[in-house]
Amino acid sequence: MKKKLVSVLLVAAMGASVLAGCGSRSVKEDGGEKKSESSGNNVLEFYHGYYQDESEWAAAQVMRDIYDEFAQEHADGDVTFKPIAVENRDDIVSAQVAGGSFPDMVDVGGGGVPQAAISQDLVYDLKPYIDENNLQDAVGLNYTQHDQDGHIYAVHDQIESRGLWYNSSIFEKAGISTDAFTDWNTFGDAMTKIADLGDDTYGYIAGQGSSYIVNAIMASTDAGKKMVESELTEDTVNSDEFANAFKTAAKLDQANGSEHTTDDNGNLMAEFNTNGNVGVLFNGVWNASGIDASLVDSIEPALFPGNVAIASAGGGLAVANNMSEEKTELALEFIKYMTSKEVQEKIFTEVQANPCNTTVDLNALAETSGDTATQKLAEACAQVNSADKIVVD
């Protein structure tokens, strides 16, 4: 189920917009919407979304450095690897597909590879390469989630893993234990206790986060989980599973207070990570890197009530079909590089994300780092990976 569509329905009930705005910066490179072969046979253009300044998002610089290292390693080859940072990668893909072509290589967004590109045979099938090189463990969840009738058209180097984070100091002050995450009733009771403290603290950041409540509640049943992992349909909206999840989320949000609702969690993120005024934040494992040093000992990871996690291979690296043999070979080598243990360890320790490679020992890396936030990242990843219910969002 598309979380933005769920959010739209929540808007109607709660009177708050929950659709995050999206950027409008276009590609800085000329010819960004030309066919992949127009750049010349000796250049492999790679569009990615890590355009942010290091001061804005340090992880973006880490990813660019990883890309640049690959380019330097292959600088003497017949094909030049050219990473291009853009904010409008999905627009570039859509424009090229509409014209019957596909970028040489692109890290597609959460929407994945457009079906129109697949139906036109514009995208390279990565599965034979993965199988021939025994990369099943290296690509991890991609191998099953991105399987389309025996074909794999994208591999994401990170797993988008979501649970929640809670402030143990606030919980202790309100007399709450981790039993609060047993189910959504105990969760609601816990949020009421936080509200009853009578100070500036409140339960959780609602709005965008409320869509995750709906999805997590639905994922607690097999029928609901199947609906979440499919397109939103009229039958889904009219189902008992959706009605129960929607009503529960609406009730929780109303009790939590409309002033604590936002269309983008980022607008109130500092309330949790820096100011310590919020009991719970629905966010991915990557939130570990945003916790202020003064709160790092108090903030802990947990799963959604009912031992539910949301995890997705997301979009990922996709390669154009019918390129030259040399360009295709370099593109495949890049995918092997990005899913290698060495790079995946950097993605965990420096990007602070859940790596796709299942052979990476996250706990060992965290202990070696000696960094509390990294250790909590490892704990969050481990919880998601071992959840009773893992739903694809």
Regions found by a protein language model. Name each.
Residues V6-L9, A20-Q115, E326, L330:
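Conserved N-terminal structural module of periplasmic/extracytoplasmic solute-binding proteins
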Residues Q72-E73, A293-N354:
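Extracytoplasmic/periplasmic substrate-recognition and gating elements
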Residues E73-A138, K173-A174, M269-V280, C356:
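Extracytoplasmic "Venus flytrap"/periplasmic binding protein-like
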Residues A85, G109-S161, N185-D189, E300-A302, ...:
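Hinge/lid segment of periplasmic solute-binding proteins
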Residues P114-A117, V285-D297:
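A ligand-binding cleft/hinge motif common to bilobed small-molecule-binding domains
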Residues H151-D157, R162, N185-E234, V278:
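Extracytoplasmic/periplasmic solute-binding protein
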Residues D189-K193, L232-T262:
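Glycine-centered hinge/linker elements that transmit conformational signals in sensory
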Residues T349-D393:
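Long, aromatic- and glycine/proline-rich binding clefts that accommodate carbohydrate-like moieties
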